[in-house]
Structures are given as C-alpha cells and as structure tokens.
Amino acid sequence: MSLTLSNVILHQLTKNDQDEIEINLRNQVLDADSSTEGLVAELHRVYSSKGAKGFALFAEDSEFCHWLKQYRTGEMDFVTFSNQSAQRLQVELAKYPFAEAGTLVMAEYQSLATDYLFIGLLPTCHSMKVTEQLDISATDYLDVAKMDIVARIDLSSWETNSDSNRYLTFIKGRVGRKISDFFLDFLQAVVGLDAKEQNQVLMQAVEDFCADSRLDKEEKQQYRKQVYDYCNGQLQAGDEVAVKELAGELPPAEDGTNFYEFTSKQGYELEESFPADRTAMRKLTKFVGAGGGMSINFDSMLLGERIFYDAETDTLTIKGTPPNLKDQLLRRLNTDN
C-alpha cells in the first residue's frame, strides 16, 4: 500500500477507581519507522474496508475545526493540536455512561495523493505471548479489527471544498450505543450526506422512471436488473454510484430522455455520486421479509407467475415449492400422521 506518514501520536485514556476518565498525554510524535508506518497502514486498510460509515461536516463554531486549521497553517504544532483534542475527548467521554478506556490514535498521512487525518479510540486487549525463553508472559495489544470509535477527515477535500457534506466519515456505532453521536460531539460536526437515504431516493426514481416510460412488466424487470448490476459492480469495486454514469448504462425513454435528465427535471435530490447500499439494491431484484416466525425471500420476477399476493386477504400463495422444502414438508406431514 502506498502510504506516506507525516505524524502519528498516541494518548492513553484510562478509568480510575471512581470510574472517572483520566488521560496520559504523550509529549512528542512517534518516530516514523516501520512499526508506526505498519500501524497506520493497517488502520487505513481496516477503516476503508468497514461498512456502515456515516458522512459529516464541521459545524460553523467547531473548536476542533479551528484547531485543525491552526495546525494546517502552521500556527500550532501537531503535538499541541493532538493534546488539546485528547483533552476535549476526555471531557466528552465523561458525559456518556458507556465511556470506555482506550488508546487515542491521531495520524496524519497521505494515501493515493489524498491527505487524511485519522482519529480513533482503539480498545486494548489482553493476551499471552511466548518469550524467547519459552515462558508465558502477559501482553497488551491494540485491537484494530474491532475499532468502532473512529473518524477520518479527508483533508484534501476539506481544504479544497469546505462546503462539501462528506469530507468527514465515521463508523456508525452499534444499536443502543450512541458512539457516533458522542464522537460527532467531540469533533463538533454534524451529519452530512445520508448514503442510505440517497439509495432509497435512487430506487424510487428508478420505479418512477419505469412507470413514466410506460414499460411493460418484462421491460421493468430488465431495467431494474441493469440498475442492480451497475450498482453491485460499483459496490464490489469499492467505487460509488455515479448517477450520470448509471444513466449511460440504461436505455432512454421513448422521448429520448435519459435517466439522469429525468432525475434532474423531476427534482430528485440526488448527489452526483454516493456509496451504494446493499440492502437498498437488493430490493430491485428480490422481495425480502421476516417476522412472526417466517422468513421469505424470492426473486421479484416470480411475483404474478409462481407467487401471488392477495392484498384483500393478505395472503401469499406459492405454486411449486422448492424440492428441498417440499421434501421437508412431506416428511413432517407423514410423521405427524
């Protein structure tokens, strides 16, 4: 991985006997050796591969943003910037009941001609190691794979387009733990681009375009499949859905209007590009539902052919069950009888 490290520093956050957060600040950056470069490269790789990221931008009165500007313009050194940030994080952590100890990692680096600032509170795990004398010894390590209190700022995007609503990304916390909320408070940032909402708007625009173009059932299915294939391809490649590029993959309406022109004229609030959402995409080609002890999943093309839904009686009828399911049903019926 091509990565150039500028600065990296660690600060320790611990809990005392009174369950209060204490901080141990480091007074100098780490040496840029193979160990630190390896750590930052792994942080970058793991963070980039994680799903469920949110997008944000700094609030107008963000103190953190002000410090970052001071650092980037040379008015403040990296150690001072990181120390002030760590102290602010300590204050924010104290407000939340789920506050956890950990190691605050702040790293400034460049990857693929883009400057980044990584900020993460990494959990420390206890383990055992074998010494050179073949003795067992306790050891601690940073659990990079399980990090979830993390944000990354695209410094290049932030400095060239401060009006962007997506230069700051963060990992959304697990349900019931408002991790992302507290980390946004720490950075004094507000939620920006909503990727899930963008995907939902795109799916609705696809359905509306099909209806407006008066496509028959088979043509609609083919159109949805083309949209799915493009979006899934972008997802697999790690690229974003580009609406104009997608329109180039799709046939235009009878009057010559392409999908991009349709979304623009109809006022769909779609960004030029955004990350694909697997759950939203799946609805283009499948019907999926679960509840009441049932889980149902079938290709949308089967609706009206082998699977029929009666809205008045809320009844789903399946003609021709899968062989393995049929075998299970017959075995159970024979056993019960």
UniProtKB/Swiss-Prot annotation:
Keyword set includes Protease: no
InterPro entries registered for this protein in UniProt: Nucleoid_associated_NdpA
Protein keywords: Cytoplasm
Pfam families hit by this protein: NA37
Localization annotation: Cytoplasm, Nucleoid
GO molecular function (one): single-stranded RNA binding
Predominant place of localization: cytoplasm
Highest taxon listed in the record's lineage: Bacteria
Keyword Cytoplasm annotated: yes
Family: Belongs to the YejK family.
Name recorded for this polypeptide: Nucleoid-associated protein PBPRA2585
Organism in which the protein naturally occurs: Photobacterium profundum (strain SS9)
